Amino acid sequence: MPDGLISLIGFFSDFGDENILWPVMALNGLLLIVQARRKIFFQWLALVIVVFGGMLVLKLEFEACGRLPGQNLYSPSGHTAGTTFVYGSMIVLFGRLPIAGFVGALAIALLAGAARVWLHVHSVAEVCVGGALGMLGVLLLTFARYREIQTSSKQKKPDWSVVVLLVGVLIVALSLHGLRSPAEVWLEYFSHRFVAPFRHCPVTLSTT
C-alpha cells in the first residue's frame, strides 16, 4: 500500500483517539442536558459506561499474559469500539431517523476497523470484538431513541443547537488531532502487573 494512502488512513483513524472522543462525548452530554432530554441522557451515559467499561475489562483480561505466539486476539480494539459508539451515537441521538444512525454507525465500525488492520495496529479478530461492542451500544441506544420519539409530544423542529454541536465537535477534533493518549500503555502495564498473577498464564520455555 502506498505511503501516502497509509498516511491518509492514519489521519482519519486519529479522530478515534481517546483525547478526542472524551471531549466529544462531553459535548454530546451537554447538548442533551441543554435540550432537557434527561431520560435519554442517563440511558446514553449508562451505555458509555457499558461500552468503555466493557472494553476496559476485555483489555485487562486478554492482555494479562502478554502476547503469545500465534495469538490473534491480544488487545481488543478500543479505538474501533470508541469511534463506532461515539460518532454513531451522535447520529442516533440528534438525527431524525435512528435507524439511519445505526446504519451510519455500522459503516463507521467497518471503516474504523479496516483502518486499524491496514495500519497493522490490530488484527481482524481484535477489531471485530471492538466493533461488536461499539455496535451493541449503538443498537441499545437506537431502541432508546425510538422510545423517546414515540413518547414525545413535541413536534420536531429545526434545532440550531445541533449545528453548534457539530461545529464544536469539529473544532475539538481538529484542535486535538494527533495527540496520543497514553491509556493503552497504562492498561497493558496494569494488566501485566496486577491481573496476570490471578491468571493461569502459560509458560513459554526458551530454547538454547
Label every model-predicted segment.
Residues M1-S75, A81-A112, P158, P197:
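Hydrophobic alpha-helical bundle signature of multipass membrane enzymes
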Residues P2, L166-S181:
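A membrane-periplasm/extracellular boundary helix in multi-pass inner-membrane enzymes
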Residues K59-S75, L111-L139, P182-H192:
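Interfacial helix-loop-helix junctions of multi-pass membrane proteins
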Residues G88-V92, G134-R145:
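Hydrophobic transmembrane alpha-helices
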Residues G95-G101, T142-S152:
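Membrane-interface junctions at the ends of membrane-embedded or membrane-associated helices
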Residues L106, G134, S161-I171:
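Hydrophobic membrane-spanning alpha-helices of multi-pass integral membrane proteins
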Residues Q150-L166:
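Membrane-interfacial entry segments at the cytosolic side of transmembrane helices
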Residues A183-T208:
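Membrane-interface segments at or immediately adjacent to transmembrane helices
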